[in-house]
Amino acid sequence: MKDQPIGMFDSGVGGLSTLRDLRALLPHEDIIYYADTGNCPYGGRSHEEIVALSERITYILLERGVKLIVVACNTATLHAVDYLREHFSISFVGMEPGIKPAIAQTKTGVVGVMATQATVAGERFQRLIARYAGDVQVVPQACPGLVELIEAGELQSETTRDAVARYVAPLLKAGADTIVLGCTHYPFLRSLIADVAGPNVALLDTGAAVARQTQRLLAAADLLNPQTSQGSIEWLTSGDPAHFAKIRQCLEIE
């Protein structure tokens, strides 16, 4: 089983930011990445829809013999990972907004969270805030439209800049000195968000932490791939493969 691939999925290209972190830490692992671009974005979908889509993709990855699945999507994690863990015996690594580390480092006592509508509205997200916030004010900001702009490859357009400015403004007004990028798509806008937010605001995402957790789980199960050559990546998508390849190129993902 050591030479079996790691499975990853996201609503689209957002999980590629996590794949980048995973490749940096585990370069010898083979990966199968499923982009559900035919159903993207997940942010406006119901809990039931997100669970059903996540379950369908899990079956697809299991048919290809993966040894672990990374749910490289905050929205799918918050809505579906509990269900997946209950119904499948394989290990899942999920994405959750980095609320805990953000709360630990804020100086102003205000943390902003940029996320999809479905993430912000989710019960698990509210539980995270209740569990870790304490005296810190956590300000959620739903960002409809950002995922679609990234999926279209508009990383530096005026439309994207205007959208980022619109979503960051309430967080700055509230006094946030730390902003959590609570969607795997958003790290691809890190430079733009940093430019809008200014030098005194820290940006956090959890891609590197997810890569480390994946490494820990594989090591504990003695499933780390012993090969010394660079691992392969197989790309799967429910949408247009040519467009998916074009966006990968735009995002500088092999």
Curated annotation (Swiss-Prot):
Keyword Hydrolase recorded: no
Binding site for substrate: D10, S11, Y42, G43, N74, T75, T184, H185
Keyword annotations from UniProtKB, A to Z: Cell shape, Cell wall biogenesis/degradation, Isomerase, Peptidoglycan synthesis
GO molecular function: glutamate racemase activity
Catalytic activity: L-glutamate = D-glutamate
EC number(s) given by UniProt: 5.1.1.3
Pathway membership: Cell wall biogenesis; peptidoglycan biosynthesis
Pfam family membership, one: Asp_Glu_race
Family matches, as InterPro entries: Asp/Glu/hydantoin_racemase (IPR015942), Asp/Glu_race (IPR001920), Asp/Glu_racemase_AS_1 (IPR018187), Asp/Glu_racemase_AS_2 (IPR033134), Glu_race (IPR004391)
Domain of life where this protein originates: Bacteria
Enzyme active site: C73, C183
GO BP of this protein: cell wall organization; peptidoglycan biosynthetic process; regulation of cell shape
Its biological purpose: Provides the (R)-glutamate required for cell wall biosynthesis.
Similarity section: Belongs to the aspartate/glutamate racemases family.
HAMAP family found in the cross-reference section: Glu_racemase
Name of the featured protein: Glutamate racemase
Originating species: Herpetosiphon aurantiacus (strain ATCC 23779 / DSM 785 / 114-95)
Primary gene name: murI
